[in-house]
Amino acid sequence: MTTEKPLNLLISNDDGIFALGVRTLANTLAKAGHQVTVVCPDRERSATGHGLTLHQPIRAQIVEGIFDPQVTAWSCSGTPSDCIKFALSAVLFTRPDFVLSGINHGSNLGTDILYSGTVSAAMEGLIDGITSIALSLTSFSSQDFQPAANFAVDLIAKLARHPLPQPTLLNVNVPPVKSEDMAGVKLTRQGLRRYRENFEKRLDPRGKSYYWLVGEVIEEIEQPDHLHLPGHIPTDVQAIGDNYITITPLQYNLTDVQGFSDLNQTQWFDP
């Protein structure tokens, strides 16, 4: 598989440098002819959000034997966001054309994105003005990351041929089915996916208490009316349920425009 023009790609994840998802993604993109650099956490960092390491040093080293020889790979002691910052500042001599994060082992749908290290790594690329892609396989049991990796090859080829007017983050979720069983690709809006959670109390061998966060997904909750989201565009949660690959454009500006308007009308504050 070859491409029209090799691209410089930076890849990270939150599942760690040894995860099958990032290995499949990086190797597939390298075989497609791209220049691939991987900088990943040295261990599992799921659900770390957009955290940064500020009060201790970050250690990083080149790793060999995990990826195809044409892939340059680093492991980093920091968070996914640290990895992208470190790569852009200290590893790469050429600005990447795209930042990719994943392929995550598990979905990043709805409000998952607020906790996701996968999405946060991609968001870090966007903050630096680079169009970025977060990729997730919506299953914890499936090990077949190849369809998602193949889609990434096609997606960046399309983005290279038809650049977006402004940098954005594309949050991509891929259903855990064979390529021939996928319904297609849909542009979606972010859904609202919450969890019924509780902290399970346990005792260690010395009789001291500790807690595990446990819970179950509430798949879909109706969006509040005041958000005025376009009802004709399906949510990522809905479309994944119908076996579509979902693409949700995201930005880092979290301003609630309707809330701004509502507060303005209250006249609580002097003009």
From Swiss-Prot:
InterPro entries: SurE, SurE-like_Pase/nucleotidase, SurE-like_sf. A divalent metal cation binds at residues 14-15, 46, 104. Its main location: cytoplasm. GO terms for cellular component: cytoplasm. This is 5'-nucleotidase SurE. The keyword Metal-binding applies. It is found in: Cytoplasm. The lineage of its organism: Bacteria, Bacillati, Cyanobacteriota, Cyanophyceae, Oscillatoriophycideae. Its EC number is 3.1.3.5. It catalyses: a ribonucleoside 5'-phosphate + H2O = a ribonucleoside + phosphate. One of its GO terms (molecular function) is exopolyphosphatase activity. Nucleotidase that shows phosphatase activity on nucleoside 5'-monophosphates. Its cofactor is a divalent metal cation. Keywords: Cytoplasm, Hydrolase, Metal-binding, Nucleotide-binding. It comes from Gloeothece citriformis (strain PCC 7424). Belongs to the SurE nucleotidase family. Binds 1 divalent metal cation per subunit. It holds the Pfam family SurE.
